[in-house]
Amino acid sequence: MSSVPQIKVPATYMRGGTSKGVFFKLDDLPEAAQVAGKARDQLLLRVIGSPDPYGKQIDGMGGATSSTSKTVILEKSAQSEHDVDYLFGQVSIDQPFVDWSGNCGNLTAAVGSFAISNGLVDAERIPENGICTVRIWQKNIQKTIIAHVPVTNGQVQETGDFELDGVTFPAAEVQIEFLDPADDGEEGGDMFPTGNVVDQLEVPEIGTFQATFINAGIPTIFLNAEDIGYQGTELQDHINGDNAALARFEKIRAYGAVQMGLIKDISEAAARQHTPKIAFVSQPKAYTSSSGKTVEAADVDLLVRALSMGKLHHAMMGTAAVAIGTAAAIPGTLVNLAAGGGEREAVRFGHPSGTLRVGAQAELIDGKWAVKKAIMSRSARVLMEGWVRVPGDTF
């Protein structure tokens, strides 16, 4: 049997928010992978260790969860008034595809840090000490994101005392602004794709549910927890070990995707695992988080649990947090009603790992709701930098 030597590609392994991923500069990729297509997808699949029928990603950099099966490609921005172009790829764990349909809000927190450290931000824009404002063009969703990255002695500051539920160790705070987060592109249409803040979602053999469909941060389907038999206090083990429940969620997600106009037939949902997300909400209740910490009902405005890539997320996807903050700011959505109704510019919600505060500024313009921006804080840190190796016949 002939052997094929491995090739090595410069890469950085980073945590951003409650996710981890492999970061690349576009011009560091092999030439065939510098353009979208089969070669790029095959490279990223092999880097992460997919597809893996065992579901472990042992032979790659992935961690066998939706939060750790991620890749990022960055380059100097081709857009005016922007520093860096950011492309995100969600790698399927057990299937041979990379989903490019949405953003990763958590890894967004690491984009600014990487861009500063890797020469993608003009040196004159980086303060010796203070906050560097990194202007990000998110290529998947065609939106602007602003990252406020702390800098000390001309270098990105990664350590600090900011605590983020779902991350064990404190780090430096990175504030993220998602400008005009509602999806007005070809696939999404208006913020509310049906024109309603609440719809009826009929799912054959499962039931009919109230649902809020929203395109903000990431396309998301919100349901009431009690309508689907939950309290809103559930942790991962309550749902991820129940294959029948996961199948029900996926069927609901598929029918919701059709109603949102994201796909034409439910059969297409299997190849679009990253979007839309599906989440369920409830009024505040006390619960014990996955770390053992008690979250009191008085600590939060509502509870939210969300699924990503077919599993209940261990904390909350950053883009889904944008959707939560946006929906909470708009009277009448299921998220807003779970939080007590009325107008608000910020909400603190409980998730499996603890709590998170997210703000959004909404206004009614010509009969349609618009959101100027959504804001939240995350943190980021370089875990490893060097080269990642893949067999030379990968692509």
Task: Indicate where each model-derived feature is located.
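A glycine-rich beta-to-alpha transition motif near the start of alpha/beta enzyme domains, typified by
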Residues: 1-395
